[in-house]
């Protein structure tokens, strides 16, 4: 799970490559803008690591629907939780999520995102991209961004890296923890 999370965090910081004349959907533009802003923050040598972390946290919180993700991750346990427990859990989940990438912001090493297109999947839009790093350590990874667009408010719901859903992996990890600790 940590390897997948590390890949996710690096992928959040990638600079997209636009195809000249491409007719990007609103969701494709969202992914491109998110990656552009992330790389601008992470490549800024004029600010401290703490400032980078604060700016990146603000960007992530504005782009990812952590409320919805946290509910999905908790699964059945969410339904039986009290309102107070739900509120405390969402707050703790956000802190956990943010802290999981805070020390990994320096891992960006020039990867680029190529937006391949998008498709509808029920109420979601899947933006298909490839992560490319060229040079001595060539890398190509397929990444699918699951987005929810509610009246123009687009949020990242999940990332699927080479067929592995990060949200489902997170859910399995949390469910295992709950099962092993009397839930």
Regions found by a protein language model. Give the residues of each.
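A mature extracytoplasmic/lumenal domain signature
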Residues: 93, 117-119, 131-133, 145-147, ...
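Non-transmembrane domains of secretory- and envelope-associated proteins
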Residues: 165, 169-183
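Early exported N-terminus immediately downstream of N-terminal targeting peptides
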Residues: 24-101, 105
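Positively charged n-region of N-terminal signal peptides that target proteins for export
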Residues: 1-5
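Bacterial N-terminal signal peptides
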Residues: 7-16
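Surface-exposed, charged secondary-structure patches
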Residues: 99-141
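Sec/Tat signal peptide C-region and signal peptidase I cleavage site
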Residues: 17-23
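Short beta-strand edge/turn micro-motifs at domain boundaries
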Residues: 142-168
